[in-house]
Amino acid sequence: MMTNFPWLTTIILFPIVASLLLPIIPDKDGKTVRWYSLIVGLIDFAIIIAAFCTGYDVNNPELQLVESYPWVPQLDLNWSVGADGLSMPLIILTGFITTLAIMAAWPVSFKPKLFYFLMLAMYGGQIAVFAVQDMLLFFLVWELELVPVYLILSIWGGKRRLYAATKFILYTAGGSLFILIAALTMAFYGDTVSFDMRTIALKDYAFNLQLLLYAAFLIAYAVKLPIFPLHTWLPDAHGEATAPAHMLLAGILLKMGGYALLRMNAGMLPDAHAVFAPVLVILGVVNIVYAALTSFAQRNLKRKIAYSSISHMGFVLIGMASFTDIGLSGAVLQMISHGLIGASLFFLVGATYDRTHTLILDEMGGVGQKMKKVFAMWTTCSMASLALPGMSGFVAEVMVFIGFATSDAYSSTFKVLVIFLSAVGVILTPIYLLSMLREILYGPENKKLVEHEVLKDAEPREVFIIGCLLVPIIGIGLYPKIVTQIYDATTVQLTARLRDSVPVLMGPEKVALTDVSELPTRAPEIK
């Protein structure tokens, strides 16, 4: 077992270094660059799997594969990386989705070297976000990750690409200022100056300061997840992005917000989390219902799926605020599940647009008659999105519902209301998804569209990509332990720590978190 091998550093730096070689590769038509990038992606994903198999213990809740190299010793600033149950499944997801996104980018012919350079740089940057254990380093990789996304949106996007890219960078960069302010405050608080996340988490912050820090982080990560009302950049970004960018936005970037909420808000500020938990639940319900209703009203296919993503992220908020093992486990599983399902749907949006050259549902209709493979893929992936039993979304949402329903941190009235409203959102999901399928595939034929000579069925590359995404979607739905065992040890430990901060009185006089006036002015110390 190669426990001393720098697995995570290699995984992060390999695609970045490989991207620097792209400008010197002789290539006229882009074919060499495509294959080179795909091979780099496959090798890096293989290294991720090797690291998981040889150096990661699923029963250990602590950080593993830890590396730490001095950077600025005077400030205890290090290149520090590690992986636990919160980060390892998302690192694997990143490698998987990004490699498929590189394959999805096969039709890109405009400036292919620059495009694949940005894709590979983003590959390493995304994994760095999930692996780094230094607050300042986290802020740096969080910011650097924005640059490739902005360039891909602004260069290869649609007609309103500059507007969408500018809105994306303004929202996300503005939110990042709150990360920097909170990180510096935590690092310089107390007698020791340190940016190490584990050291920062052990500091005894004043309770009111915890609340301010939690609010700052929440604003920053609410943009990325996204959470209403800081979500408006996402439909615009998806509306102008290409298929590979779609896959990375839905599959990876949104999960960065959920991961950071768990890692920093819940993990480092558990006392404040106990106070903000009802707010997260309410925001989660708003996300589910509002986005589902808005998605139903959309006539643009990309924007419809984008609002669907926002709706599904609401379950992540409810699960992480449930204070139960199964609820928190469901939140993590929902992030993984939606990463796969969202990537598949947006890839199909791109494949459909390449053939029909329209995103307006009113201009579609009857395309399933000529594209039977596309018809089958759209139907299957939509069933996964509406949480059909036997698929990953069903398991994740049921776990969140059960976790919240069995939580003793909330009053019965509040739980019933939340579950009822969330169920309304769940019911709305098949309504807008099935109506979408009808308008694309089953509706009256658009003669100009159906008779168009380029309206060809899915090619083997497209079938392969969707097949690769459906295998884990169905696999998790049938046997969720294949994924939950990776993170269960960590989420159980985190839940126990969070419950220590919940002012619950055992017996008939227990305090519900929905009554904030009954919370103590200072939460109990973490044992």
UniProtKB/Swiss-Prot annotation:
Transmembrane residue ranges: 5-25, 35-55, 90-110, 112-132, 136-156, 168-188, 211-231, 242-262, 274-294, 310-330, 331-351, 386-406, 416-436, 463-483
Subcellular location field: Cellular thylakoid membrane
InterPro entries per UniProt: NADH_Q_OxRdtase_chain4, NADH_Q_OxRdtase_chainM/4, NADH_UbQ_OxRdtase, ND/Mrp_TM
Domain of life: Bacteria
Keyword Heme in record: no
EC number(s) on file: 7.1.1.-
Membrane topology: Multi-pass membrane protein
A biological process term (GO) from this entry: ATP synthesis coupled electron transport
Reactions performed catalytically: a plastoquinone + NADH + (n+1) H(+)(in) = a plastoquinol + NAD(+) + n H(+)(out); a plastoquinone + NADPH + (n+1) H(+)(in) = a plastoquinol + NADP(+) + n H(+)(out)
This protein's record includes keyword Thylakoid: yes
GO molecular function, a single term: ubiquinone binding
Enzyme class: translocase
Record's GO cellular component terms: plasma membrane-derived thylakoid membrane
Keywords for the protein's UniProt record, in alphabetical order: Membrane, NAD, NADP, Plastoquinone, Quinone, Thylakoid, Translocase, Transmembrane, Transmembrane helix
PANTHER family cross-referenced by the UniProt entry: NAD(P)H-QUINONE OXIDOREDUCTASE CHAIN 4, CHLOROPLASTIC, NADH-UBIQUINONE OXIDOREDUCTASE CHAIN 4
Function: NDH-1 shuttles electrons from NAD(P)H, via FMN and iron-sulfur (Fe-S) centers, to quinones in the respiratory chain. The immediate electron acceptor for the enzyme in this species is believed to be plastoquinone. Couples the redox reaction to proton translocation (for every two electrons transferred, four hydrogen ions are translocated across the cytoplasmic membrane), and thus conserves the redox energy in a proton gradient.
Family statement: Belongs to the complex I subunit 4 family.
Name recorded for this polypeptide: NAD(P)H-quinone oxidoreductase chain 4 1
